[in-house]
Amino acid sequence: MVMKKIIMTNFNCDNCGDCVKACMEKNKVGRIAIMEKDGKYIPIVCQHCASAPCKEVCPVSAIEHKDGYVYLNEDVCIGCGLCALACPFGAILMEDKAYKCILCNGDEPACVKACSKRCLELVDVNELIFAKRDKSLDLFSKMSLPTQKSDNSLISKITIDAKVKP
């Protein structure tokens, strides 16, 4: 199963609002927010958590997992706001009801398409995990192994620092 998420790929967001406008045009209501933190702007979208706190607190079961994604049934939602409070990312927006990213129902996400700074990207979660793993393995492979004679190896530094000095 291919699971996709929208992630922020750089910190070039200038709060132009193009992603929010595109989302509103496509979905009738904005499902993305832009947060400002220390002079940087960060687009906030649902991360479709595997163990979604928003789903757990919904008193009317308006939120469900399906095919690896978190869906909110706006027709069932009563607008209590508990899901918005429970979301660790602040990705559920409240008006009369709760609204969250639905990844444009499988189409290319409007926010990703509209971002002129290329801050947002739709990624395959598995590819992202494997890319991070490969990067870590590459870094480890460049470290000196304990059997190699090198004062620069990570193991050498740890053992030298750990020795008791007279």
Curated annotation (Swiss-Prot):
Residue sites binding [4Fe-4S] cluster 2 per the record: C23, C101, C104, C111
Gene3D superfamilies in the cross-refs: 3.30.70.20
Binding positions for [4Fe-4S] cluster 3 per the UniProt entry: C46, C49, C54, C87
Superkingdom, taxonomy of origin: Archaea
Binding site for [4Fe-4S] cluster 4: C58, C77, C80, C83
Ribosomal protein as UniProt keyword: no
Binding of [4Fe-4S] cluster 1, residues: C13, C16, C19, C115
Keywords carried by this UniProt record: 4Fe-4S, Electron transport, Iron, Iron-sulfur, Metal-binding, Repeat, Transport
Domain 4Fe-4S ferredoxin-type: 3-33, 37-67, 68-97
A GO molecular-function descriptor: 4 iron, 4 sulfur cluster binding
Protein name: Uncharacterized ferredoxin MJ0265
Organism placement in taxonomy: Archaea, Methanobacteriati, Methanobacteriota, Methanomada group, Methanococci
